[in-house]
Amino acid sequence: MNKNLIILILSVLLISCSKDDSEPVIIENPSSNVFYYGADLSYVNEMEDCGAVYKDSNENFKDPYKIFAEAGTNLVRIRLWHNPTWTNYSNLNDVKKSIQRAKSEGMKVLLDFHYSDTWADPSNQEIPSAWLTQINNTGPLGDLLYNYTYNTLNDLANTNLLPDIVQIGNEINAMILQNGELKWPIDWARNSSLINKGIKAVRDINSLKNKQIEIMLHIAQPENGLWWFEQANAAGVIDYDWIGLSYYPMWSEYDLNSIDTPIKTLIETYNKRLMIVETGYPFTLNNADSANNIFNENALITGYPASEQGQLNYLNDLKTKIYQSGGEGIIYWEPAWVSTGCSTLWATGSHWDNATLFNHNNKSNLGIQFYNASKN
């Protein structure tokens, strides 16, 4: 039975059993745990500076944050790099701008600490260059991580830009804060100490500012979440609120028909809330520029063509699986990373232009209707 329905039934019983019918009874909102329909909009500031303009479904030019808010998006995910000297984006000043834009449109914010000067993912967990001298000194390195997390959040608090959820690392399948080629197996004495330092920084800011920022740990692909959280739990990493998963079917052992299995297992085993914080699907196999797209025909699922309707159906069906399994959110990764004349580390253009929620004329496509369900 739906847990919100149980709360509602208990609330009704509470009213019925009240000794004094004239005495007001305060009832907890049975929908306090809102299902999150999210969008990672980390690229938007850069895309606009590169000349991108966005249009809603009626061909009206509009702020992309407003387009997503009006569609029904209720959570914006923003990445933060430590000191990315190779770009002017995803640093703290850029993140502040993004958070302000999200909050101005009434959307909540998930702040994603990469703890790196560049992309952190299953293949890369590169330590910030400023911390490299302490890479083999877990205590001092943990202090650097703690102070950076604490000071960043304190700075955001002082400008009324605190996020609602914080990720301690991005796709941290491997041990965090490494140099060069990843080392396996995970040194859990080191890894747990560092992760717990980040967690403590968030909890301490909550105490200082009387806030309730929630903490998420993020792993790429559900099958990796199964072993990772088991090892993390055994190593004493237990004080967090959310399990975050990346889910891209082309790289996962679980298809849409079986994704409910690991979701249920993780929720029931660790008694944590769970969200898919990265996913995506192509609406076309055509490329808008010379940058190779991440998704090609290998990304396609039987029954879900590379079309706007196929993309929308994928999102709706994945959301249903997550919800029915006890999960509480889904975030589309970079739905506004449209093609421009600007360059990435690898090419000119976008590697995601066939998987955005905008067509190649930057008009919002059918897939963005996925967010409409949050209004129901």
Describe each region flagged by the PLM:
Residues 42-44, 81-83, 114-118, 168-173, ...:
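Active-site beta-loop-alpha junctions enriched in small/polar residues
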Residues 52, 286-317, 321, 325, ...:
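Aromatic-rich peripheral "rim/lid" segments of glycoside hydrolase catalytic domains that contact
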Residues 29-97, 101-108, 114-145, 244, ...:
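N-terminal substrate-binding region of glycoside hydrolase catalytic domains
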Residues 39, 68, 112, 166, ...:
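Conserved, mostly hydrophobic/aromatic
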